[in-house]
């Protein structure tokens, strides 16, 4: 009897910049897969999925899938990520908006 394993390599980093993670209170309203951009909800002071409309409001990228029951989120607070690997919201309708989502943070999109 033989066993066949399949390995799929997944490396979302776009270059050799270090990627660091952190944790913060979560305020998600639905399931969110890893690589979802996050922003700070100023009224609840919790991380939520980026709305896709506010330039420079994204502060991190979700590192581990989470949902509305997740009280703490693990997210990338720095690093360089490939444009095509980030799970952009539908409201982020053009490339410029996506590339400037993290303006002023330690996250770069290539």
UniProtKB/Swiss-Prot annotation:
Residues 1-18 have a biased composition (Polar residues). It is found in: Virion; Host cytoplasm. Keywords: Capsid decoration protein, Capsid protein, Host cytoplasm, Late protein, Viral capsid assembly, Viral release from host cell, Virion. Stabilizes the expansion of the capsid head shell after genome packaging. The packaging of viral genome in the procapsid triggers a dramatic reconfiguration of the capsid shell, expanding from roughly 50nm to 60nm while the capsid thickness decreases. 415 capsid decoration protein molecules cooperatively bind the expanded capsid, thereby stabilizing the mature capsid shell. Belongs to the lambda phage gpD family. Homotrimer. Interacts with major capsid protein. This is Capsid decoration protein. It comes from Escherichia phage lambda (Bacteriophage lambda). The lineage of its organism: Viruses, Duplodnaviria, Heunggongvirae, Uroviricota, Caudoviricetes.
């Amino acid at each position: 009897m033989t066993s066949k394993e399949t390995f799929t390599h997944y490396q979302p980093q776009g270059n050799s910049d270090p990627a660091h993670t952190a944790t913060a209170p979560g305020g998600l309203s639905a399931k969110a897969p890893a690589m979802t951009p996050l922003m700070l909800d100023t009224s609840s002071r919790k991380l939520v999925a980026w709305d896709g409309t506010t330039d420079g409001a994204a502060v991190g990228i979700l590192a581990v899938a989470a949902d509305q029951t997740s009280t703490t989120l693990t997210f990338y607070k720095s690093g360089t990520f490939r444009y095509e690997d980030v799970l952009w919201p539908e409201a982020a309708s053009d490339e410029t908006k996506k590339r400037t989502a993290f303006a002023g943070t330690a996250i770069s999109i290539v």
